Amino acid sequence: MAWFQVMLFVFALLLRSPLTEGKDPDFTSLLTNQLQVQREIVNKHNELRRSVNPTGSDILKMEWSIQATTNAQKWANKCILEHSSKDDRKINIRCGENLYMSTDPTLWSTVIQSWYNENEDFVYGVGAKPNSAVGHYTQLVWYSSFKIGCGIAYCPNQDNLKYFYVCHYCPMGNNVMKKSTPYQQGTPCASCPNNCENGLCTNSCDFEDLLSNCESLKTSAGCKHELLKTKCQATCLCEDKIH
């Protein structure tokens, strides 16, 4: 009988071990291979993108990306708790990245809201207030980012922050030259009057510019130039789209 009680005690300890804590229902309900989780993440992002202040005229509606999700989950699984390289989060275009670490399973909506709340330290047209970090916010609302994919991992190798959240945004935002204006201020959808859904633009571009002066190059050299064919695809192929 005593032996049986000891075995029950050992079994109870195993149930509380770090290797199994991460598999509890609270964690598994956050896995992003579930359609309802994907919808929660996309809907929360679009809700917040609609609510920016001042309002934006060119903010794209976000959609789920399987490719971006695969990359985000791969990085989360490494449990390094730092940003990945740009190559690790590239699909056909480069993607940005937001990270979140937690001691306990946290709802995706709560995670995303925490990124958005950095707007309290952001002044449109000026940038971050002194000694403040706002990169999560600016990437979340970046006007041309429209594909999103996220992943979550349980990291027993970490002492405290055992839950690692990763979201990839494509195309990437936080362009240094535009970081104080992550979108164009104006009436919602003013930049896309014929491609609007509930205050967000739907005329997205699947290409990106790799040079900052593509518009002037298009005027001077034209899109048939070999340089523009490879470095200015958004400018040349997405003339009537947000990019």
Curated annotation (Swiss-Prot):
GO biological process, one term: cell-cell adhesion
Annotated Gene Ontology cellular component terms: extracellular region
Ranges for domain SCP: 42-169
CDD domains, alphabetized: CAP_CRISP (cd05383)
Tissue-wise expression: Testis.
Keywords of the record: Disulfide bond, Secreted, Signal
Cysteine disulfide links: C189-C196, C192-C201, C205-C238, C214-C232, C223-C236
InterPro entries cross-referenced by the UniProt entry: Allrgn_V5/Tpx1_CS (IPR018244), CAP_dom (IPR014044), CAP_sf (IPR035940), Crisp-like_dom (IPR042076), CRISP-related (IPR001283), Cysteine_rich_secretory (IPR013871), SCP_CRISP (IPR034117), ShKT_dom (IPR003582)
Domain ShKT positions: 205-238
Subcellular location: Secreted
Signal peptide location: 1-22
Subunit description: Interacts with NSUN4 isoform 3.
Name of protein: Cysteine-rich secretory protein 2
Lineage: Eukaryota, Metazoa, Chordata, Craniata, Vertebrata
